[in-house]
Every structure is written in structure tokens, then in C-alpha cells.
A protein has these predicted regions:
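Glycine- and acidic-residue-biased ligand/ion/polar-headgroup-sensing regions
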Residues: 58-60, 64-70
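A short, N-terminal "cap"/entry segment at the start of jelly-roll beta-barrel domains
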Residues: 1-37
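Short, surface-exposed secondary-structure edge patches
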Residues: 42, 62, 76-80
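Short acidic-glycine-tyrosine-enriched beta hairpin
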Residues: 77-91
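A short hydrophobic beta-strand segment most commonly corresponding to one strand
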Residues: 88, 103-114
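Short beta-strand His + acidic residue motifs that chelate non-heme Fe in jelly-roll/DSBH
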Residues: 52-53, 72-73, 89, 95-102
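A generic "binding-loop/recognition-motif" signal
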Residues: 47, 58, 77, 93-94, ...
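Conserved short histidine dyad/triad with adjacent acidic residue
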Residues: 26-30, 41-57, 91
Length: 114
């Protein structure tokens, strides 16, 4: 199966009370995960935009930074991430990501079930 760029579902949404919107491109659609996960997206955050702090229960989330930099809340500890870095939020833990940089930040987001 090939999904062309123009066929991807795109959406803008506020997540977990974070400021601004995420700008997402859905790489897999619902039903394509074979009960292994629920999200595989490329997400862009503009300057000042964020995914608010939230907990994962029954699943885990991976962020891989493609472009730019961000402040990442790793279960209460803040660290700076840049292009090439990967952050994993295991089941039961909390995280958030905030674009503090001057330009856009892009990341791959993957949520897999426990």
C-alpha cells in the first residue's frame, strides 16, 4: 500500500490544554494498527505552541524530533530536545512538550498499547 502526500489526513487540535494547536499529519489511519497502537503522526508545533502535560495509561508514547528544538517534561523533569533526539513516555508516566524555539518544531509521534 502506498499513501501519497495528498492522501494523508491533516488536522489542527489543542492537546491536553497546551497553548496553541498541534498541526498533525496522520501516517496511519484508525484500523491500520492491528490492535497494537492508536497513533502514528508527524506533528508540527509553532513557536509558543505545546502539547500539555498528560499521563499515559495502558499505552506508551514515543516522540522523535525531526526539526527544531523543544522543552520536554519527562515525568516532572524538564530537558531540552533537538533534532535527532527521541523521548519515550512509558505506561503510567507523564509528559509534555513545548516549542520554546524561534521556529517550527516537527516530531514523529507514536502511541503503542501495553
Amino acid at each position: 500500500m502506498i499513501r501519497r502526500k495528498e492522501d494523508h489526513i491533516r488536522f489542527d487540535k489543542q492537546i491536553a490544554g497546551g497553548p496553541g494547536l498541534i498541526h498533525a499529519t496522520q501516517l496511519l489511519n484508525e484500523g491500520e494498527f492491528h490492535d497494537k497502537g492508536r497513533l502514528f503522526n508527524i506533528v508540527r508545533l509553532g513557536p509558543g505552541e505545546a502539547v500539555g502535560r498528560h499521563q499515559h495509561v495502558g499505552d506508551m508514547e514515543v516522540y522523535h524530533i525531526l526539526k527544531g528544538q523543544c522543552r520536554y517534561d519527562d515525568n516532572g523533569t524538564e530537558v531540552m530536545l533537538q533534532a535527532g533526539d527521541t523521548a519515550v513516555c512509558p505506561d503510567g508516566e507523564w509528559h509534555a512538550v513545548h516549542n520554546d524555539g524561534p521556529g517550527d518544531m516537527e516530531m514523529v509521534c507514536l502511541i503503542l498499547f501495553k
